Swiss-Prot record:
Binding residue positions for ATP: 14-22
Domain of life per record: Bacteria
One Pfam family of this chain: AnmK
Molecular function via GO: ATP binding; kinase activity; phosphotransferase activity, alcohol group as acceptor
Known catalytic reactions: 1,6-anhydro-N-acetyl-beta-muramate + ATP + H2O = N-acetyl-D-muramate 6-phosphate + ADP + H(+)
Xref: NCBIfam families: PRK09585.1-5
E.C. number: 2.7.1.170
Protein name, UniProt field: Anhydro-N-acetylmuramic acid kinase 2
Signal peptide bounds: none
Pathway assignment: Amino-sugar metabolism; 1,6-anhydro-N-acetylmuramate degradation; Cell wall biogenesis; peptidoglycan recycling
Length: 378
């Protein structure tokens, strides 16, 4: 039975803390993609972004031991207010009203993610108050997408596989194609000819490269991969890094943005350090492809890392795969993650599963997220 296509709004702020709120409209029934709507980046004010960076630092010290850092409450209130305003602004700009919106998918800001280990469930913390957002927008808000999966033994990530599958449905002969998202970490979604999904974090992506550039006082990121392009990969350190046990570990598996750092290139030059970190990210993608039952021959890349041509060239070289940008296929590469959470919000309203044994390792397929009901606008 076909269900009506409805507009949903998705929100995402990544762990690289680029200072922006990603917000996107998507028309969907929770299974198919009806239309891509407008999307936008709304910057946090400088104070909020600085506060979130303090939260990441506090979360590392906290490590799920004892009471949460007090700073979380202030940050949660500020980002909920800012992201609510971003939703309202995008909806108005699109010529819609909140009455036209079925739900908002509010991921929140991840400050800490600890994957499960033998004998221990995983834990995760995203800052964001879904109840407050629902009250502000007078619209249903789906939030806290990861906790239930982790309490049931799953990795809590990646959540994007089912949306990536819907994107692959828009292509012909997609069985040889996988989707690679390059955010703070890199995650991949592949689907075989029978429609079976596999998804996992392959390794680091932008986070350690950005952190290295910031540490060297060279800005916020390696813009366009220019620094890495000037450097040479340190073969000895590169070879040692490739022996990291995570790379050969069977999926499902997930990472926190701090699981891979940049200390191991500390004594290299700026350019050589950036080149070596970038090559490691690219090779980790290749190692991830090697774990799949059928190795894809093409990657469609979304997320901020797709704007780094040096990284994309290295992925093609080290991972031995054809690399396309999301825009090459008519997708919105900057909006993919935000669109995903709009899609997941609609799936939650319909109680459709989001996580699976092949994606997060949870034993049985599960819906994701809690629903905060908003009253109709008056």
């Amino acid at each position: 039975m076909a269900h009506d296509m409805r507009w949903c709004v998705g929100l995402m702020t990544g762990t690289v803390l680029d200072g922006n709120i990603d917000v996107a409209l998507l028309q969907t029934d929770g299974e198919r993609i009806g239309a891509f709507g407008p999307h936008a980046l709304y910057p946090y004010d400088a104070g909020t972004n600085a506060l979130l960076k303090q939260c990441l630092s506090a979360a590392q010290t906290w490590a799920f031991n004892g009471p949460e850092p007090a700073i979380f409450a202030e940050a949660e209130a500020r980002i909920t207010r800012a992201q609510s305003d971003a939703v309202a602004c995008l909806v108005e700009t699109a010529g819609l009203s909140m009455r036209d919106i079925a739900a908002v998918g509010f991921h929140g800001q991840t400050v800490l993610h600890r994957a499960p280990a033998p004998g221990r469930l995983g834990q995760t913390r995203q800052l964001g108050n879904g109840q407050d957002m629902a009250r502000r927008l007078a619209t249903d808000v789906v939030y806290d997408f990861r906790s239930a999966d982790m309490k049931a033994g799953g990795q809590g990530a990646p959540l994007s596989a089912i949306y990536h599958s819907a994107l692959l449905d828009t292509l012909d002969n997609a069985h040889d194609t996988a989707i690679l998202n390059l955010g703070g970490v890199a995650n991949i979604t592949a689907r075989d000819a029978r429609g079976m999904l596999a998804a996992f974090d392959t390794g680091p992506a932008n986070a350690p490269i950005n952190d290295f550039v910031v540490h060297r006082g060279l800005g916020e990121m390696d813009r366009d991969g220019q620094l890495a392009a000037q450097g040479r990969v340190d073969d000895a350190r590169f070879s040692t890094a490739l022996r990291h046990p995570y790379l050969s570990r069977p999926y499902p598996k997930s990472l926190d943005r701090f699981d891979f750092g940049h200390d191991w290139v500390a004594d290299l030059s700026d350019a050589d350090g950036a080149a070596t970190l970038t090559a490691f990210t690219a090779s980790a993608v290749g190692r991830g492809l090697d774990l799949l039952p059928v190795r894809p021959t093409r990657l469609i890349v979304c997320g901020g890392g797709r704007r780094n041509p040096t990284l994309l060239k290295m992925i093609a070289t080290y991972a031995k795969v054809h690399v396309d940008n999301a825009e090459d296929w008519g997708w919105e590469g900057d909006a993919t993650e935000a669109q995903c959470f709009g899609y997941l919000a609609m799936r939650r309203l319909r109680d459709l599963p989001v996580t699976f044994a092949e994606t997060t390792g949870v034993r049985a397929p599960m819906p994701a997220g809690r629903i905060a009901h908003g009253s109709s606008p008056g």
